[in-house]
Amino acid sequence: MNKKNGPSLGHNKKSLLKSEVEHIDITSFDSRKIIESMKKMSFTSRDTAKAAEIYNEMINDKDCAIFLTIAGSTSAAGCMNLYSDLVKYNMVDAIVATGASIIDMDFFESLGFKHYQGNQFQDDKVLRENYIDRIYDTYIDEEQLQACDKTCLLYTSDAADD
């Protein structure tokens, strides 16, 4: 670990891309007790408990359609399986996401590529020299991202020809 408790700063691609981001499995634990205990706390803890209560009401209301909107890099940060589980277990009815979330994160990983734990303090010059892109403290292999883009281009080119 280095300053600011991040993964150690490396200087070559192999050392920079050594720790894969692991996606959370919401089926592996029960968070209800800790969230319920947050009702008696302050700040965002209490807000989280209140949000959970509202969400439970929404789930139990058969006339309520729940849309999950995703912007930002939460898929790359380890929430990818969370979204599919929310659909699988009827906890959301629809997902609306940005192109970056769908292509550069979800589709990217469906091709077998990974996101890696990084460090927000890593020198951008070192990253660029190693063809690594940074999403805050997450790394992505630029060459793999280009392969993802080329794959998308193949599909969209075929669709445009139809």
Which residues fall in each region the model found?
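Metallocofactor- and cofactor-centric catalytic cores in central/energy metabolism, strongly enriched
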Residues: 2-137
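Active-site- or DNA-interface-adjacent structural scaffold in DNA-acting proteins
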Residues: 139-149
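Conserved small/polar residues in nucleotide/adenosyl-binding loops
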Residues: 155-160
